Amino acid sequence: MAKAINTRRRRALKTGIQGLGLSSLLTGCGSLSKVLDDEIKLDPDSHTESHQRLVGKKPTSAKDQGSAITNHGQAPDKNPRITTESPAHAQRQDESSSINILSLLKLPTIEREFRAAWVASVANIDWPSKPGLSSASLRAEIDRICTQAAFIGLNALIVQIRPSADALYASAIEPTSEFLVGQQGAALADGFDPLSYWIQSCKQHGLEFHAWFNPYRARHASAKSGFHAKHLAKQQPKLVVKYGDHWWMNPAEPKALEWSLHVIDDVVSRYDIDGVHLDDYFYPYPIQAKDKKQSALDFPDETQYKRYRQLGGRLDKPDWRRSHVDTMVQKLYQRVHKQKPWVRVGISPFGIGKPALRPAGIQGFSQYDQLFADVERWCSEAWLDYLAPQLYWKIEQQSQSFEVLLNYWSERLGSKRHLWPGLYTSSIGQAGRMWTSSEILAQIERQGRQPLATGHIHFSMVALLNDRDQIATRLHKGPYQRPSLVPSSPWLSKGRPERPQLIAPDQRGLLSWERPLGSQPWGTTATRWVLHHRANEQSPWSMTHGDVNLNPIILKAKEQYVLRLLNRVGEASDAIAFTWQI
């Protein structure tokens, strides 16, 4: 993405061209009271629920939360310590046990909002801080970013691992990036694989990890080392062209497309990532031609276009170019989900739509005509799981208003996919930009008003790490004060986890539930838990969540609890509500 160093792109932005769940039974003297029965049909995590807005909300009273659920009665569980409420017990306390019976409970909703930041590696914008760091320093920087992200209240990071047909991970296909090791193709120190460590650290901090690829750029203008022998420019030089100070993979060459898709396939197959992410670099941003008779230097693909026409092709050159990018986006979406259906595909295009569809008053750069990105078609065809248009302008900037453009993309995308706009948080404190943290907070508030926009992404992490104009502090104390889960993606999921069958806690309050034997379909396999708890019916609900294999649940006596299990795309099981007393 490299907006901080790309002067042509800055001009475009400025002008608008701008379970612990133990598998074995725990012994103890605790008691559970199960409140909900199997006859109540509740979808606690529908797509509609994921649109509940969080921005600016404080904890509400118990009477304001959830929907009323009553019990119709059912047979007791096999575990004698898990007692089922029935109408006969609803008005009294069971004298033969220490169970407190609940006759009516208002279920809390799962609060959801995508809160993420881009971590750019190109030109060492965010990470690594400089090339050639030791593996210990790389680990320390990764942990610092993840710790700060979790503290602020983020729930995902989007990390650039392929900026220029290179790799910030262990790859047998492409050379190691000079932004990581200093010299393209140099070996990683002591066999350290940064991507594996990124994923591990994100899991430990409760963050999703989305791998960010540039599909076409072969060399960035800031690069200092030459092409390594393993680089595409050396392996298949006919697939790469020079455009100004950049080298670019030619989108018109089918082998170039296959090369990039093979790289992404490799990462998806070998690493436990949550998402595949593309930014706005399809065809390159236009470069001013030296011949002033031309407004911009034309991309060097005339040979391929002539060949296409000679073979009977009828598209004009702009439509022909767009067809290549369309094919890439479609094939990427299909191939990722063929391998791992739960890995979400996201695209972050330039923020202004095609000229023919723009709202009144919106002006500026046309990615449809200049980058040959028909984003509106991708939305219509649903070739993505989330759209993150880069809305890098202020609310009050009429020709490129943040709010007007947010509403535009909401109309284009509808409710069938996620809309998570990109925020230009790095503009805070930049000379001449006059951005403050208040502008970003206002944009988050406006995003919260748009029911189809269920999150946002900060460009970039460095602004949050450095707490520019107290942006990280204000997020932590303000709109991110309450935790939030990533919105679910129900179109990807076949099934959802079953409601947990609880096993009575031991005296420490360590909760577990029965695990299915053998392998299960991924959609019904629980990977995370979410627990709401409160002291009594007059108290607001608090929400915690964790990985079923990493984060144990420790209960406190006498509190009320609602537990749900989630699969890889956030689809939730039915809830089980209970109290526990020693």
Regions found by a protein language model. Give the residues of each.
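N-terminal export signals
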Residues: 5-6, 11-33
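Conserved aromatic anchor
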Residues: 509-523
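Polysaccharide-binding and catalytic clefts of secreted carbohydrate-active enzymes
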Residues: 162, 200, 205, 234-383, ...
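Active-site-adjacent "subsite" loops/lids of carbohydrate-active enzymes
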Residues: 120, 124-137, 216-266
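Extracellular fibronectin type III
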Residues: 570-582
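Catalytic domains of carbohydrate-active enzymes, especially glycoside hydrolases
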Residues: 140-165
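Beta-strand-rich modules
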Residues: 555-571
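Substrate-binding cleft of secreted/luminal carbohydrate-active enzymes
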Residues: 386-395, 417-486
